[in-house]
Amino acid sequence: MSRLTTFAALAAAAVSLSACAVTNDLAKVPEPMGRFLLGHSVTVVEEPEIGPFSREATDEAWEEAINFAMEERFGRYDGDKYFHIATKVDGYALAMIGIPVVFTPKSVLVASVTLWDDEKGEPINEPEIFTVSEELSPEALIGTGLTKTADEQMLSLARSLAKSVQKYMLE
């Protein structure tokens, strides 16, 4: 993904909350996905684009947040065929403290995701690029830079990503 494309995606997502994914559905029975059983969730963070006005985050923190969110969502499935989810963080912006109503930066994550068939040992799709923003919440309206830590923002973005990946898989 080119730097220009990454920043364009970051900018587009940062100005709109309409793309927020509500992920509070984890207490419900998951929609069936055939024989799906989560094998591994692997996350790679190699020199991601960091958007303007972003808090810093370590690669390890991103890996932990995304793997947790993927396992939280996909670990509920009990099929009999293993699949792996490989995620590459392409870019992000973690909202900094802003001025409510006047300037409320939004957090955004751009990631490429590939699904792998364990039995065949090969990917079942070309990398799918996802651009997600934080879960819709009252805090998001005033700016999560004021109300959440960077770790909380990353977990929210990771959960939105996992929800978007699930939606993609169900299509």
Name the predicted role of every residue range.
Residues 1-21:
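Sec-dependent bacterial lipoprotein signal peptides
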Residues 20-64, 170:
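A structural "domain/chain start" motif
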Residues 21-34, 146-171:
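Terminal low-complexity, intrinsically disordered regions
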Residues 21-35, 109, 114-128, 135, ...:
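Intrinsically disordered, low-complexity linear regions
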Residues 56-81:
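N-terminal, post-signal-peptide region of Sec/Tat-exported proteins
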Residues 71-75, 94, 162, 166-170:
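Sec-exported extracytoplasmic/periplasmic mature domains
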Residues 76-124, 135-147:
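Surface-exposed short loop/turn segments
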